[in-house]
Amino acid sequence: MTMKLNYKRVLLVGMAFFLISAFWQAYDAITPLILTNHFGLPQSVSGTIMSFDNILAVFMLPVFGALSDRVNTRYGKRTPFIFFGTIAAVIAFVCLTFIDNYQLSLLAAEGIPSLTAGTMSEEAFSLFVRETTLALTLKNPLPLIGFIATLLLVLISMATFRSPAVALMPDVTVKPLRSKANAIINLTGTAGGIIVLVLGMVFATSKKQYMHYTGYVLAVCGVMLFGFVLFLLTVREKKWAAEMEADTEKYGLGSSSDSKAADGGVKLSRPEMRSLLLILASVALWYVGYNSITSKYSVYATNILGFDFNFTLIIAQAAAIVSYIPVGIVASKIGRKKTILSGIVILASAFTAGFFVTPDTPELIMYPVFALAGIGWATINVNSFPMVVELARHGDTGKYTGYYYTASMSAQIVAPILSGFLYDSLGMRYVFFTFGALFVALSFLTMFFVKHGNSEVIEKKSALEQLDVD
């Protein structure tokens, strides 16, 4: 009897990741622009504030992942966290824009949006405006304080349900099918990101330096609530988790007795622990490289290249969407480790190519660069999380999800702070892609020595069975 992935079920579970990805796409796009353009903060300070979500995540994601392992309600273990966290995040996100609007009114009262370059160079004028804006912020810091306080509420709300949302896929999917399932999860997440990027083009978020973002954020929250409602109406967490346990027993893949691992009854062997640590180190390294690009690309494209960052990122997301399912299939044939190593090479090559794109280069040259980056990131991302939870026993999936996010979020604390400092010290033009490519390349070394985390290869009897889904 052949194991079959229920694509529809995984797609519906992925609605939680859909709304999470929609939020982060908007957050990463507009928050650095608000901090640098509306408050006049230097890149190093902006990068530090942008790392707040990762600092919170290092502590909160493992806690809420492990907590959701132990919760048992009529709606399941993960759904209650998704319910309350989403509602709180949406409300706080909208409130954030009201504070930004107040700051913009203060800038308008001082005539800052009406300033023109005159005989000044574009670079000198940009520096003059930023310093003038920063002086106004320091004179009246209350809007910035209120903005950061509300931002923390948004980030705390998101952190309460990210691990539970991601842990839900392994809860309802047997181990050998998790790379394919994770491809679908990433597909839904990328779809959420692309929708938000299209909204960014509609609202022209890359064109207006002193834009009011309330309308844009309301539209983004509408996308989030669409995924949220669809998730609540269709996902039956307890029923589907019970069916997964039955399938696990039926195919001899382990048993629910593995749940004693959550209480320390079963520990990883020394080689397994070594592989886990190497996987987590790899995750940290490639996230430092990747996040240094994604968290500041809106600033780099707008201020250095003069490009529309929204469409470039859509190209990357579209390439990733095309790649997710084939990558999951490839991993089931040649193994997750080999697939990830190839993805690292692709991503590092893309970032290296990006270094050679200058303000004088036609914008369309950046499109294949980011398409390649999207393919590389999809190849890595589809397989890295399943490698971590492959080492988990049934009862501690949430805890291992927390380990994964501790590694990735710790890296994303370092990335914006370190890269921001280097941008301020050495200039963004020459450091931006170099920094990203270097750290992605380093992850190849740690991943090369991983020995555990691959799934059993699934072989189907015929070509027709390769298309067999529920």
Language model features with spans:
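Intracellular loop-helix junctions on the cytosolic face of multi-pass helical membrane proteins
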Residues: M1-N6, L127-T150, S157-L168, V172-I293, ...
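Helix-loop boundary and gating motifs at the non-cytosolic
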Residues: T2-N54, L277-S282, W286-L305, T312
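Helix-to-loop junctions at the C-terminal end of transmembrane segments
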Residues: F59-Y75, S323-R336, Y423
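Cytoplasmic membrane-interface "Motif A"-like loop-to-helix N-cap segments
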Residues: R70-T86, L107, K333-I344
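A membrane-interface helix-boundary motif in multi-pass transporters
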Residues: K77-T79, A204-G222, F421-F439
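C-terminal ends and interior cores of transmembrane alpha-helices
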Residues: F83-N140, I346-D360
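Intracellular juxtamembrane helix-capping segments at the cytosolic ends
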Residues: T160-T173, T379-R393
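C-terminal transmembrane helical hairpin of 12-TM major facilitator-type secondary transporters
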Residues: K338-N381
